[in-house]
């Protein structure tokens, strides 16, 4: 019997944990901006600042979490502690109605948990296979697909719980999901005994001040306290500036490490792709902030006598990614003919073009709202689905190129820099863009009147901004295509 005939048993526990982690994270994310504005009565500017700071830090901490796992905790312990912290964070978030300080503390705990979890769950999965095991790619594909299942279900379940019961119930359901995933994972603990555990030698080296686990407890208590400070706007900006400077310094070091012109060109391609990815995600991340508030205020959400909770719309994007991803994988076959760089830029142009089309649909929706008071639900669904489809032509393409680079020992670092720019910096920029929609006035009774014209203007500007990016990418695509054609003609002559 072939020992590679099926996946290792341990993978199913990792997959279960991944499903519930996505459920927990995206369920809470779907509720957060609505909770800040509708329940805590934050003004839009304050809510956007906090939301973007939270989303930015989520993409910074995995770098630290990966370092901690490599040096001290090991992937398995880091994943378990991360899951536990995220569950605790969601519980504390549900209690933030009691006192505002719980809000910042809860988000900080979730960020720390996410940092420990996200960077290490993939590494833990990798430990289940030998380097040459042919099942490896299938295992990672299974984990990715499972995560999408969680992100589809989460906004529906948590949105329903919040709408029918309470905000605490919605956040509590996210916590229950994370706890369920952790319990399932612990039930399969015996399948992970061969994976790398806690580095006791490192812990013993610091035993002269505190017991082994004392240092870990200090870290778990101090880190949320430190990150809580970063949620003030100025400090979060400073943190991103420092992280970006460090990232650029690392890029310069990698460039000097390149041994030939081919490697330098590969690095230049990755840097350029990362820049356009950053702009793409600054537009796409409006889904959790300005678009969510637009849906809540200006879209007719009634369907068959039921008012669809705003949070449920967050499932449309994930569903489109999964459905279109399956279509591309099974129906569209990658051509091996032609130049790979030309194909890469063609895909980026398509992704940015679809993003522009999605926001064009949202602009039409907003204009409809201005004329008739509310926009139609199908138009909103179509716009979000097109934007979800666009994602498939950006991140997978960029990440594939990063893994192809021939400079040894830099793939992980480049992945971290890509996440920093397309995740952390993009989310900060998304907050700046979303804040342009925060125009409101008060009527004679003191009620807030939100400006639909602000949404029209911002959605329209993003439409043209994404289209301008398409133009720039097409110029690069045309240059690469002509260069490839001229090279081919020279070889034939």
UniProtKB/Swiss-Prot annotation:
CDD domains: MFS_DtpA_like
Cytoplasmic side: 1-13, 70-77, 122-137, 188-211, 256-266, 333-343, 400-412, 483-493
Subcellular location: Cell inner membrane
Protein name: Dipeptide permease D
Gene of this entry: dtpD
Membrane topology: Multi-pass membrane protein
S-S bonds: none
GO CC terms in record: plasma membrane
Keyword check for Transcription regulation: no
Superkingdom as given in the UniProt entry: Bacteria
Periplasmic side: 35-48, 99-100, 159-166, 233-234, 288-311, 365-378, 434-461
Database matches in PANTHER family: PROTON-DEPENDENT OLIGOPEPTIDE FAMILY TRANSPORT PROTEIN, RESISTANCE PROTEIN MDTM, PUTATIVE-RELATED-RELATED
